[in-house]
Swiss-Prot record:
Species assigned in the record: Streptomyces griseus subsp. griseus (strain JCM 4626 / CBS 651.72 / NBRC 13350 / KCC S-0626 / ISP 5235)
Annotated residues for binding of GTP: 106-109
Native organism taxonomy: Bacteria, Bacillati, Actinomycetota, Actinomycetes, Kitasatosporales
Protein name, entry field: Nucleotide-binding protein SGR_5570
Residues holding ATP: 55-62
InterPro entries in alphabetical order: P-loop_NTPase, RapZ-like, RapZ-like_N, RapZ_C
A Pfam family matched in the record: RapZ-like_N
A GO molecular-function annotation: ATP binding
Main function: Displays ATPase and GTPase activities.
Region (Disordered): 1-43
Amino acid sequence: MTENTHETAPNTADTDTADFDTADTDRADGAADVSTNTPNETGEAAIPELVIISGMSGAGRSTAAKCLEDLGWFVVDNLPPALIPTMVELGARSQGNVARIAVVVDVRGRRFFDNLRESLADLEAKHVTRRIVFLESSDDALVRRFESVRRPHPLQGDGRIVDGIAAERDLLRELRGDADLVIDTSSLNVHELRAKMDAQFAGESEPELRATVMSFGYKYGLPVDADLVVDCRFLPNPHWVPELRPFTGVNEEVSDYVFDQPGAKEFLNQYTELLQLIAAGYRREGKRYVTIAVGCTGGKHRSVAMSEKLSARLAAEGIETVLVHRDMGRE
């Protein structure tokens, strides 16, 4: 299955800003808000699956949590880390009614972080299946988001927003290294973030491997969350063909032009074969997701056309694919 997200990310991070979690960053009292879903009426008692959502304030933790809630997860927001094992135990006593728990953890102090490490060690000792999803974003994007909603960063104190961001990034550095999934939302709007979450968690049975194919423009920077990067700048640029310049790689005229160039089809065929080899290795290593970044100069023509074809090829090979055109609308 291929999911196309042709909505393009603007060069500022203020789209749907309120749907990212800057609005929740002033809740430092540790009070837990519990969002419940209708439980199943069947099922035996079992240890529930656990996802821990954390990351930078303003990077989209609340959006990620809402996505999981929509997918039927039992979501607990702003839960003190020390209570995570208790929540899992309560889920295990629910006789199968709570099979999947997502916990949003807001680590704002050293003691909170120590409690989280202790809780993770406790869960590991009890053989609880857990995943850590870490949401991050660039300093510039986070500053724009906080400024757009006119809220201070929870850790800035009497300083500036950038001071709070720096303090939080340093505090979360170790947790980011332990994360199973890191999502950079610097250039994503909320719809694209939801698409990424859906790619990882949607469906009753998860596929063996899920891929995000993302076209981008080198002039706007490499996607920081890319696992593999493809450079399409070896192909002639449709930008210099006047009748093609207004179009994008989604349009048939541009796609035909790109794949009529020497080496284009051969590259697509050989790279698809290479990805099949890599995918087999990822499966053996237990890797569940991969982000493939496909770049050209501006992210409008060549990379878009190649990403369209590549995502279709991967879907035909049984790899569930999300297609994102990061920079297609910037020029």
